[in-house]
Amino acid sequence: MRKLLLSLAMVTGIATSFAQQKVLVLYYSENGTTKTVAEELQKQLGADIEAVEAVEAYTGDFQATIQRGNKERESGQWPAIKAIKKNIKDYDIIFLGYPIWFGTYAMPIATLVKENDFAGKTIVPFCTFGSGGLNTSSEALKKALPKANIKQGYGVRTARVAAAAKELDRFLIENGYKEGEVAPLPAYGELVPVTPEDSAVFSAACSTYQFPLGTPKMVGKRETETTTDYKFTVKSTGMNGEESASTVYVTVGKEEGAQPEFTEVVR
């Protein structure tokens, strides 16, 4: 109990310090999903907010975006963006949002970080994705912005964006960005071989995803007040015949009728 009280006191102290800082939610959204998360962040934080816009807007069509993105990546010509109205120098903390494209932040964000000075700023990434990309995009930001302080970020699958409000509440409190109390999440249990029941949970959560994720081999679990969470080690074989491993996270709500949900894959 003493440890919990000390942790809560530390979080409260951080949140008090955070309240004295100026915060901007700065984001790019192609089809509105990242915008939904950005506006929820702005609502919970009471921060300023601004959207990054490409001069030549992307169409929102999946295949068209892939084709255009491939051309931009191959040529190294990132898309021109409209000048942002906010002055980055006026802010201490910037929540930087984007969809994941090609395993990292969307190309308009590449232009943004190249053309603006983020030195000395605290950057909190947030992203939306089909399967994952928070970890890889955060590492890319660290390389692109070596003089900024890149913090732990938040990511959510597009298919689960309705869960963002509740998850952001926990994320912001846990990381000291707003006041409040949340019980710490337990650690996942030791990895053990999957059972047929575990495989059924994995299949129910992942079978509708458009790309094969592989075969679950090991699993660690944890119980929270509202969910049973699974951390699967998954093996797959690429087109070159080489085997690779990834971690796939699945959650199952404890309410009646809840279905398993695939939350993220980390490669």
Report residues per predicted region.
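N-terminal trafficking/processing presequences and adjacent post-cleavage segments
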Residues: 174-210
